[in-house]
Design a protein with these regions (language model features):
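Residue-level signal for the start and early helices of compact helical domains
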Residues: 157-159, 168-172, 187, 285-287, ...
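Acidic, Ser/Thr- and Gly/Pro-rich intrinsically disordered linkers and low-complexity segments
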Residues: 150-158
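An acidic, glycine-/histidine-flanked metal-binding catalytic module
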Residues: 1-120, 127, 144, 206-394
């Protein structure tokens, strides 16, 4: 049968209107040759054993994630055995395009989209230099954080701020990164800014403002390195604080308020304020309206000594067949490598500032991390499995 002229709009939408490929309903792969070319443009060569092994690892990881994290409360949904056991990724691509068998098409496409996300759910720099990254970021704060038994403070002396908690988060799990990316409209590894997270908890909201001021005045963070569009403040009303500070200073100038009481009066007022409304365009739609914090993303210039080249040279030195021509050629190549080359790069970290009340809310109720992750999971289920869930309910 002669095929009529058509345009593969589903494949072109990500290029023409910015729609995420995750939201495309299907692929347009017509043959194994097409699948080979598609994978090659993706960065994988099916003829290379290492590439096939990496794809198989991603496939297995993706199926485990779907079944463990998305389907545990959907017993009516089961990945068809034919799709679940197929190890040839090219066939999954073909099935993702073939509408002749709708159920197979839907599940093959679900699996490949999750494979795509897992291929983005890691950071090369975090995996290779994660310990050094955290140490250098923590190193910016360590000289300013003081602990005396149960008491913690940011700085010492008159400008210090009492803290109830200070911590730096450990490495983000790949499944957590995948879930985060799957709910984003723009799903890509470069969109994860919180591989490293720093949190400071103050006793009241006014001290949260003082923490921001301290970080700036002591260059603990550089405001030039704060990422535009990655700041979210739902903790303190800056405009209202500015107006009230002007009012209090005018009262002091008029002799109606002692100068030494200006800040204490401002503290009292700030702590009585209602929480500000969240921005209309929040970069995290899963954040609860009950969650209040100051958050921003800052870049840290990381400097590490890469010892891999030195290890390569030492390996060749220990080989018992150093006279072999091939080994000699490889050793000559290793000699041209800098044994202790320096690596420098920018790496993001997210800083959160909360008051004690907001911190306690974040550990229970609507603002808790567990509830936040569940909202995220439900959005991902709808995005990937919405049609299958609705069909199963019919």
């Amino acid at each position: 049968m002669k095929r009529r002229f058509s345009i593969p709009w589903d494949d072109l939408s990500p290029l023409l209107d910015g729609m995420s490929a995750i939201d495309s309903p299907r692929l347009e792969i017509r043959s194994l040759e097409d699948a080979d070319d598609f994978l090659e443009s993706y960065g994988y060569d099916w003829r290379i054993t290492e590439d096939r092994e990496e794809l198989e690892k991603l496939r297995t990881e993706s199926i485990d994630f779907i079944e463990r994290d998305l389907l545990f409360d959907e017993p009516q949904l089961v990945i068809p055995r034919e799709v679940r056991t197929e190890q040839d990724i090219r066939k999954l691509l073909l099935w993702s395009s073939d509408m002749t068998y709708p159920e197979r098409q839907r599940w093959a496409w679900v699996i490949f989209r999750v494979i795509h996300i897992f291929s983005h759910s890691s950071s090369y720099f975090d995996e290779k230099y994660g310990d050094a990254i955290r140490e250098q970021i923590l190193g910016r704060f360590r000289p300013h954080v003081f602990s005396d038994g149960d008491a913690i403070s940011l700085g010492t002396g008159p400008g210090s701020v009492s803290l109830s908690a200070f911590d730096i988060r450990g490495r983000k799990a790949r499944t957590s990164a995948a879930l985060k990316l799957l709910h984003k409209r723009d799903a890509g590894g470069s969109e994860i800014f919180d591989w490293v997270g720093v949190r400071l908890v103050t006793h009241d909201r006014y001290d949260a403002l003082r923490v921001v001021r301290y970080l700036r005045e002591h260059n603990v963070v550089n405001f030039m390195q704060v990422q535009p569009g990655r700041t979210r403040n739902t903790l303190i009303d800056i405009d209202r604080i500015e107006d009230e500070l002007v009012e209090l200073n005018e009262l002091a100038r008029a002799g109606k308020l002692p100068d030494y009481m200006v800040e204490s009066e401002l503290r009292k007022r700030v702590n009585q304020h209602n929480y500000p409304s969240p921005p209309e365009k929040s970069y995290n739609p899963n954040s609860s309206l009950a969650y209040h914090s100051i958050q921003f993303t800052c870049m840290q210039r990381i400097h590490v000594r890469d010892r891999d080249n030195m290890i390569v040279s030492a390996f060749f030195d220990r080989l018992p067949v150093r006279g072999n021509p091939m080994v000699k050629a490889l050793r000559a190549y290793a000699d041209r490598l800098e044994p202790n080359s320096d690596v420098r790069f920018l790496f993001p970290f997210e800083l959160q500032i909360l008051d004690q009340h907001s911190y306690e809310l974040s550990r229970s109720g609507l603002a808790s991390h567990h509830v936040y992750k569940e909202r995220q999971r439900q959005r991902v289920k709808e995005r990937l499995l919405g049609e299958s869930i609705r069909r199963a309910a019919e």
